[in-house]
């Protein structure tokens, strides 16, 4: 430990440069991870936050909610097997509504399910859906579109007017805010091919016969654009981590080669290989931890100045995960240098410098 920290102190510029590179790389990893998670949440938070672990969709829907059409008989089949409280059918469609007395239009995803079920949205402002057929509860992000509680929006199919009575939170679908309506009104606002249920949300682990049951992850992966967005950003993150490991490895390898004579002297006076190897690992750990701490501070600062509509979400578990990954790749990056330290011969190293 003493040797590692003393060397860091003596060679501030050398280690400062690699530290700066590590800060930039870890900062990029955190930013892209935040964007990936934010896009994921912006695309599918309504499904992610459902208190359901499985879904029943139509066999021919390719696991896509917007394609799925489930008949009432199929719903009864599932409900009879698991119970009414554990199986809740719901409908989904996307549409463009227009604000009353305004030319302002807003894209929305319309959800409809039974009242007082586990799919009912939690209200953060205003009131929950009542029995009236002209009310809607919307995700609070709709305020960015100029729609607030008390405003009226018009359905393009039925020309029916709906008043926003409450806001919920974290309810997005396909990058559009979700609005909730009563089941009774669905028939008037849907096209002829949209009358059936889209899916059945299950809050049970029972085996269900004569039904196409999939888990939540499969539903998320089938939302338009979800898999493609996440795949692209995950690949970028993976490349950044590989680049970080290579840079750390090359840096410490070059440093170790430059210190061959000093390492030989240390070995000649009785310093053990384990002590020298430990010093190298401590340096890598110190730099990676400092780099991650600085990166986290920078990312949190960036998060404060990002526009409200920017899909950015970085949770504490995610940060902890990347801190652990970065520490691991820092240690892996020193492996080739550790081998170089172990194979240094004291006599050859000292003699080579004479």
Language-model features, listed with the residues they occupy:
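Peri-transmembrane interface segments
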Residues: 208-261, 265-266, 277-281, 285-286
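Hydrophobic secondary-structure segments that place a key small or acidic residue at a functional site
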Residues: 91, 104-114, 121-184
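Short helix-to-coil transition segments within interhelical loops
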Residues: 8, 265-274, 353
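Membrane-proximal extracellular/periplasmic loop immediately following the first transmembrane helix
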Residues: 45-97, 107-109
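Mechanotransmission and gating elements of multispan inner-membrane complexes involved in transport
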Residues: 158-160, 167-240
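N-terminal Sec/SRP start-transfer signal
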Residues: 1-29, 353-354
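Short helix-loop junctions at transmembrane helix boundaries
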Residues: 278-279, 285-331, 335-352
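Alpha-helical transmembrane segments
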Residues: 14, 27-53
């Amino acid at each position: 430990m003493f040797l590692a920290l003393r060397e860091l102190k003596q060679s501030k510029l050398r280690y400062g440069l690699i530290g700066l590179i590590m800060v930039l790389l870890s900062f990029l990893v955190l930013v892209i991870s935040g964007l990936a998670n934010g896009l994921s949440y912006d695309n599918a938070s309504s499904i992610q936050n459902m208190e359901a672990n499985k879904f029943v969709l139509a066999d021919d829907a390719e696991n896509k909610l917007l394609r799925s059409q489930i008949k009432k008989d199929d719903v009864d089949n599932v409900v009879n097997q698991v119970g009414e409280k554990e199986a809740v059918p719901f409908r989904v469609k996307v549409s463009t509504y227009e604000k009353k007395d305004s030319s302002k239009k807003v894209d929305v995803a319309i959800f409809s399910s039974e009242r007082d079920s586990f799919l009912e949205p939690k209200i953060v402002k205003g009131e929950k859906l009542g029995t009236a057929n002209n009310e809607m509860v919307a995700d609070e992000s709709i305020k960015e579109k100029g729609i607030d509680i008390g405003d009226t929006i018009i359905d393009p199919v039925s020309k029916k007017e709906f008043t926003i009575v409450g806001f919920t939170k974290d309810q997005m679908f396909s990058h559009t805010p979700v609005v909730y309506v009563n089941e009774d009104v669905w028939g008037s606002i849907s096209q002829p091919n949209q009358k059936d249920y889209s899916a059945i949300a299950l809050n049970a682990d029972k085996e269900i016969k004569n039904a196409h049951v999939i888990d939540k992850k499969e539903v998320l992966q089938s939302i338009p654009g979800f898999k493609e967005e996440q795949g692209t950003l995950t690949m970028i993150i993976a490349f950044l981590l590989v680049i970080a490991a290579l840079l750390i490895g090359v840096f410490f390898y070059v440093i170790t080669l430059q210190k061959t004579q000093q390492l030989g002297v240390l070995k000649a006076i009785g310093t053990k290989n384990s002590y020298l190897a430990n010093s190298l690992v401590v340096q890598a750990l110190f730099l990676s931890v400092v780099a991650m701490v600085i990166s986290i501070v920078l990312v949190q600062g960036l998060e404060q100045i990002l526009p409200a509509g920017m899909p950015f979400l970085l949770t504490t578990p995610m940060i902890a995960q990347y801190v652990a990954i970065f520490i691991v790749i820092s240690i892996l990056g020193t492996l080739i240098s550790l081998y170089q330290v172990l194979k240094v011969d004291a006599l050859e190293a000292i003699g080579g410098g004479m």
